[in-house]
């Protein structure tokens, strides 16, 4: 029965005995408290200041002002430093900024910043001090903070020590709902290390040095690693879509197409400053967010082109993690310093019309430059009568060290060589009538004095792919003829190889065309991470799935016309993998994995494994196979001299490795033989035990253990007694000549 007033006692209805003060509603008041605008959101409180007298106070204020103005606008008269009754400062100050955003930036960028060797700033919002420091929220008695017991962490680079001693590499596979990490066993079944269902909700990703495995979830991103595959970090970003590491694994960027919405009860990691943002940059070591950003407005769509998407990655890193930059297309490039995430020199780099930029993948060591620098390249289109331009900018000086004017430009792509020694600018040019198009390759020699630019032959066809040799100076392009209209069959492609001429001394010669292989369907280039070997493939194509394995340092005879070039090209092998969508080399450059992903199609999903020569080692069809990714290796710890010594003695090491491989294979074969022999011996023992049991049962029943033998003896005796001859079996063998041939051997 539902309660009603009739069920209440008279005493319960006596209003005189009801006292409102006895009802504690503090929890409800705190939960549903409305934050009224009090006008203090532009103020911050700075603790940790040195104690000064009234005479010393102006000097401290001026010194402090230099740091305060690095994040926003404030003045001396907007800094209030209270003094005690003894005439000395109380070691804190109130600072007013011109906007709430600047106050938030001060908290984010100046908190824990050293003022000098003995003093470190602690910066908080005045509103936060009032909110968290009000009566009842702080205990009168000091309670020491709880410090968790220290537990040593497993070595995060343990994967470098292969327990078999064979130097195998690991890879991760995502199939169905399962994610597993495996040791590569060449022709044999991969050795499973860990396999977990529902480990990720969308995809997995290795960090650049192989330390972490990233998994994606609706609530955010998680990192895993170590020999026990423990969770090493959580980065809560609701509805996250993408994530990317910095090159040295110090930072992580997460992005969601949905703006962050901070609930009234707060968020475990994000603050109200992050509300409405799409990108978050995290410090991996602490798990704390450094700064968040909103999506930039996209330029208006061209009605003749598909809708624009937000660029990814939107934040690009310098090779040493000291800087991260973001492009505002058509306007500027913003460079931020890590870990404070403050804008370099407090200003963006204004570049009118800028379309794209790329950091050098390694620290460039330009000739004659001894100071520290990082470098990025950028390009701008033709604007009015001004030509298109490609520029190289040094950071942190922001000096443009080289620029190049370009004319009749349709599009530009920027391609850095892995060590930052070369930059290839692929320029698509149009004729005056804009009816025909050609491509030129402008190569910047970054490490040479003055950064000279070399123009490679003009290419009449459209270049659809370009790739530098890692740690080398050779490159490939794939070209095709652009069809004038819709065609039923895609036009054929051509593969062109380029390399430098031989030259005296340490200088690299001019780049020359080595060879072109036409009438192909190839559309993708995959260099070995060690250089020399390259796979040219046809991916995402229903009609073709070719794989061509090339060696650019073939040790055989070199064609006469190529003897002055630094390459000897040889096609080692060809293969075919139907439905292929992806190709990836292992970090050692010994093996190549290809796979057909269920994310692209559902036909014959699975993977193939090849060696660097193109010999297929393994093929496995896997239902709902989605992803395979090799685990990267960190750079070697060996000095250059030690590496040279190893290369010098490589033949001796090879003999040892070949002997170990032969013994391992022989051992595996012997193990199979021993196992079969053991099974056969077990069967013989079982049969013998059965015979013994039958004999014992027959003796107990008074029956012969072999009645067939007894019957045969009785029948033979009966035949002999009747005078008949013993039965005999006669076999007749007939041979027939089917074909006869005669061969004369000289």
Curated annotation (Swiss-Prot):
Q: Which range is the signal sequence, renumbered to this chain?
A: none
Could you cite one Gene Ontology molecular function of this protein? translation initiation factor activity
Pfam families, per database record:
eIF2A
Fetch the CDD domains from UniProt: RRM_eIF3B (cd12278)
Q: Where is this region: Disordered?
A: 1-20
Span of domain RRM? 42-128
InterPro entries (UniProt xref): EIF3B (IPR011400), eIF3B_RRM (IPR034363), Nucleotide-bd_a/b_plait_sf (IPR012677), RBD_domain_sf (IPR035979), RRM_dom (IPR000504), TIF_beta_prop-like (IPR013979), WD40/YVTN_repeat-like_dom_sf (IPR015943)
WD repeat residue numbers: 195-234, 247-294, 307-346, 349-386, 458-500, 517-560, 575-620
Q: Which UniProt keywords apply?
A: Cytoplasm, Initiation factor, Protein biosynthesis, Repeat, RNA-binding, WD repeat
In the UniProt record, does the keyword Cytoplasm occur?
yes
Q: GO:BP terms for this protein?
A: formation of cytoplasmic translation initiation complex
Biased composition regions of type Basic and acidic residues, renumbered to the chain: 1-11
Localization: Cytoplasm
CC terms in the record's Gene Ontology section: cytoplasmic stress granule; eukaryotic 43S preinitiation complex; eukaryotic 48S preinitiation complex; eukaryotic translation initiation factor 3 complex, eIF3e; eukaryotic translation initiation factor 3 complex, eIF3m; multi-eIF complex
Tell me the subunit arrangement: Component of the eukaryotic translation initiation factor 3 (eIF-3) complex.
> What does the similarity note say?
Belongs to the eIF-3 subunit B family.
What role does this protein play?
Answer: RNA-binding component of the eukaryotic translation initiation factor 3 (eIF-3) complex, which is involved in protein synthesis of a specialized repertoire of mRNAs and, together with other initiation factors, stimulates binding of mRNA and methionyl-tRNAi to the 40S ribosome. The eIF-3 complex specifically targets and initiates translation of a subset of mRNAs involved in cell proliferation.
Its name, as the record gives it, is Eukaryotic translation initiation factor 3 subunit B
The organism's taxonomic lineage, starting at the top: Eukaryota, Fungi, Dikarya, Ascomycota, Pezizomycotina
């Amino acid at each position: 029965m539902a309660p009603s007033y009739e069920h209440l006692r008279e005493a319960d209805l006596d209003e005189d005995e009801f006292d409102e003060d006895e009802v504690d509603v503090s929890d409800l008041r705190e939960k549903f408290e409305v934050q009224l605008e009090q006008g203090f959101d532009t103020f911050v409180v700075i603790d940790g200041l040195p104690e000064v007298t009234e005479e010393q106070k102006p000097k401290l204020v001026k010194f402090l002002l230099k740091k305060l103005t690095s994040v926003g606008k404030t003045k001396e008269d907007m800094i209030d430093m209270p003094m005690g009754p003894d005439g000395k400062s109380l070691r804190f100050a109130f600072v007013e900024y011109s906007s709430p955003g600047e106050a938030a930036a001060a908290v984010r960028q100046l908190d824990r910043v050293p003022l000098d060797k003995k003093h470190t700033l602690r910066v908080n919002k005045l509103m936060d001090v009032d909110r968290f420091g009000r009566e009842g929220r702080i205990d009168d008695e000091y309670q020491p903070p709880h410090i968790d017991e220290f537990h040593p962490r497993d070595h995060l680079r343990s994967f470098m020590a292969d327990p078999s001693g064979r130097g195998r590499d690991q890879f991760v596979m995502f199939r169905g709902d399962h994610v597993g990490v495996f040791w590569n066993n060449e022709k044999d079944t991969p050795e499973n290390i860990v396999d977990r269902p529902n480990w990720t909700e969308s995809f997995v990703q290795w960090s650049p040095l192989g330390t972490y495995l990233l998994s994606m979830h609706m609530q955010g991103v998680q990192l895993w690693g170590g020999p026990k595959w423990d969770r090493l970090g959580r980065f809560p970003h609701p509805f996250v879509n993408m994530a990317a590491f910095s090159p040295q694994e110090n930072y992580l960027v997460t992005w969601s197409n949905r703006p962050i919405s901070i609930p009234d009860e707060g968020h475990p990691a994000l603050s109200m400053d992050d509300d409405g943002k799409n990108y978050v940059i995290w410090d991996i070591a602490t798990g704390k967010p450094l700064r968040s950003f909103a999506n930039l407005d996209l330029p208006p769509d061209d009605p003749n082109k598909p809708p624009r998407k937000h660029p990814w990655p939107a934040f690009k890193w310098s090779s040493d993690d000291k800087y991260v930059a973001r492009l505002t297309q058509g306007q500027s490039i913003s460079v931020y310093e890590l870990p404070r995430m403050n804008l370099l020199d407090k200003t963006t780099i204004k570049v009118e019309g800028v379309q794209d930029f790329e950091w050098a993948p390694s620290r460039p060591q330009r000739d004659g430059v001894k100071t520290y620098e990082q470098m990025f390249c950028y390009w701008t289109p033709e604007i009015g009568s001004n030509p298109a331009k490609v520029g190289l900018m040094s950071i942190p000086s922001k000096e443009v060290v080289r620029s190049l004017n370009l004319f009749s430009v349709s599009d530009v792509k920027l391609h850095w060589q892995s060590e930052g020694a070369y930059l290839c600018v692929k320029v698509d040019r149009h004729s005056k009538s804009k009816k025909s198009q050609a491509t030129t390759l402008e190569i910047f020699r970054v490490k040479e004095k003055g950064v000279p630019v070399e123009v490679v032959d003009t290419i009449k066809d459209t270049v659809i792919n370009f790739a530098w040799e890692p740690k080398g100076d050779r490159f490939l392009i794939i070209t095709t003829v652009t069809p004038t209209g819709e065609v039923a069959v895609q036009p054929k492609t051509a593969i062109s190889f380029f390399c430098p001429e031989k030259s005296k001394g340490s200088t690299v010669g001019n780049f020359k065309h080595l060879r072109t292989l036409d009438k192909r369907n190839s559309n993708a280039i995959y260099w070995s991470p060690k250089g020399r070997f390259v796979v040219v493939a046809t991916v995402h194509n229903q009609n073709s799935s070719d794989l061509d394995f090339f060696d650019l340092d073939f040790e055989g005879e070199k064609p006469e016309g190529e003897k002055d070039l630094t390459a000897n090209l040889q096609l080692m092998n060809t293969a075919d993998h139907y439905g292929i969508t992806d190709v990836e080399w292992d970090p050692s450059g010994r093996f190549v994995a290809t796979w057909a992903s269920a994310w692209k199609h559902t036909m014959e999903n699975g993977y193939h494994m090849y060696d660097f020569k193109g010999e297929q080692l393994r093929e496995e069809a896997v239902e709902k196979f989605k992803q395979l990714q090799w685990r990267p290796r960190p750079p070697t710890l060996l000095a250059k001299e030690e590496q040279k010594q190893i290369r010098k003695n490589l033949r001796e090491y090879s003999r040892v490795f070949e002997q170990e491989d032969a013994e391992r294979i022989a051992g595996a074969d012997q193990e199979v033989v021993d196992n079969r022999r053991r099974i056969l011996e077990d069967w013989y023992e079982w049969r013998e035990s059965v015979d013994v049991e039958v004999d014992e049962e027959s003796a107990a029943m008074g029956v012969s253990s072999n009645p067939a033998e007894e019957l045969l003896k009785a029948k033979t005796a009966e035949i002999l007694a009747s005078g008949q001859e013993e039965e005999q079996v006669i076999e007749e063998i007939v041979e027939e000549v089917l074909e006869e041939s005669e061969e004369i051997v000289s």
